[in-house]
């Protein structure tokens, strides 16, 4: 009605619609959801090229990583994303240009498929500006040349386009004709995780033992969720205590069997506190890490449950972790948690060490 559209500068939008109601965004939450969506894509194919916080190319070419139909894969991705409480639009095509344009055709939650051999019929009637890289200035120059649609651009004279736009000119012709050759370039994969750990730095030193123990269990819960997300179970727990900017100590314990249950390894970390701390010592930072990984699917089941780990209690703990993980994934990290976590929700900074050298 007022001419306001997405990606428009807010100053311009305010001029067009001065009576609009403005709300503040939550970039941290936006970034969190972006990470989760990219994680969903990576469960379908290792070739995921993120190009912005809310956009990515991914390769599901039949036979490359799966024999399943790309359309079926994309529908499953949309269903997974919808469980986060958001929507996504997907375009399917033989190259990036076609897929990108197709993704813009139907929103929200659109799925536009351009089958091989139909690219020119799909692209030809669209305005030249529908193709990425053609902004207002380029579109205006093309219009002066009598080129207003992608079909007209695909039939443009190669030499003339080169004289006006340089080497980019012939490339624009190829892209407009749907003949672009492009590859999805996945981000360089990190080395396989050697450890998963989290730390919390407190605004003020803490000296109370109960509060330190609660902090250890809180940080363990953060590491536990990351372990489950990665499908990992560790057998060595490490506790780190930092007293000030220059003094820190760590202690380790090997557990009877691999686990990703923070109630198990968090309790073990609490038992390590006596090796690093004595009453009255000020604590600035607490860290809990797990290493000695065994892939979750390769876990060997024990013939008998170890010692005091009652089978029913262990199963209930696993079920509780699974449910809380799902709730946090859908509604955010603050949706559910233990009462002890409330005291650490503010006045702390959270860090995630990347490896043993950081831990």
Language-model segments: residues:
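Gly/Gly-Pro- and Ser/Thr-rich, intrinsically disordered tail segments characteristic of DNA damage-repair
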Residues: 1-174, 187, 225, 311-359
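Short Gly/Ser/Thr- and Asp/Glu-enriched loop/turn motifs at secondary-structure junctions
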Residues: 51-55, 93-96, 232-236, 281-285
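Short, hydrophobic beta-strand segments
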Residues: 56-62, 250-253, 302-307
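Preference for bulky hydrophobic residues occupying beta-strand positions
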Residues: 58, 90, 239-241, 253, ...
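Short glycine-enriched loops at secondary-structure junctions
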Residues: 94-96, 178, 291
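DNA-contacting surface of Y-family translesion DNA polymerases
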Residues: 130, 138-283, 295-298
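Acidic, metal-coordinating catalytic segment for phosphate/diphosphate chemistry
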Residues: 257-359
């Amino acid at each position: 009605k007022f001419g306001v559209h997405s990606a428009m500068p807010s100053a311009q939008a305010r001029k067009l619609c001065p009576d609009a109601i403005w709300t503040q965004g939550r970039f941290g939450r936006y970034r969190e959801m972006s990470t989760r969506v990219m994680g969903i894509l990576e469960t379908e194919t290792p070739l995921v090229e993120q190009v912005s916080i809310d956009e990515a190319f991914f390769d599901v070419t039949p036979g490359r990583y799966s024999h399943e139909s790309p359309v079926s894969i994309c529908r499953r991705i949309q269903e997974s994303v919808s469980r986060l409480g958001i929507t996504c639009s997907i375009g399917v095509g033989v190259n990036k240009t076609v897929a990108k344009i197709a993704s813009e055709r139907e929103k929200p939650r659109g799925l536009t498929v351009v089958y091989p051999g139909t690219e020119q019929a799909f692209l030809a009637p669209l305005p030249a500006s529908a193709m990425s890289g053609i902004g207002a200035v380029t579109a205006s120059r093309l219009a002066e040349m009598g080129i207003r649609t992608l079909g007209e651009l695909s039939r443009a004279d190669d030499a003339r386009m080169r004289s006006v736009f340089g080497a980019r000119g012939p490339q624009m012709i190829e892209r407009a004709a749907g003949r672009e050759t492009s590859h999805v370039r996945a981000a360089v994969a990190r080395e396989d995780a050697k450890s998963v750990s989290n730390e919390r730095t407190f605004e003020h030193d803490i000296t109370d033992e109960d509060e330190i123990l609660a902090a250890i269990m809180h940080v363990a819960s953060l590491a536990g969720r990351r372990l489950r997300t990665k499908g990992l179970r560790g057998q060595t727990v490490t506790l780190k205590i930092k007293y000030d900017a220059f003094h820190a100590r760590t202690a380790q314990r090997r557990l009877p069997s691999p686990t990703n249950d923070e109630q198990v390894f968090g309790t073990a970390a609490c038992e390590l506190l006596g090796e690093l701390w004595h009453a009255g010592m000020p604590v600035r930072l607490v860290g809990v890490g797990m290493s000695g990984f065994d892939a979750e699917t390769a876990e060997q089941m024990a013939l008998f449950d170890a010692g005091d780990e009652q089978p029913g209690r262990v199963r209930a703990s696993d079920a509780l972790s699974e449910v809380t993980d799902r709730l946090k994934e859908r509604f955010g990290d603050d949706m559910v948690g233990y009462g002890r976590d409330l005291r650490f929700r503010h006045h702390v900074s959270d860090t995630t060490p990347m490896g043993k050298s950081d831990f």
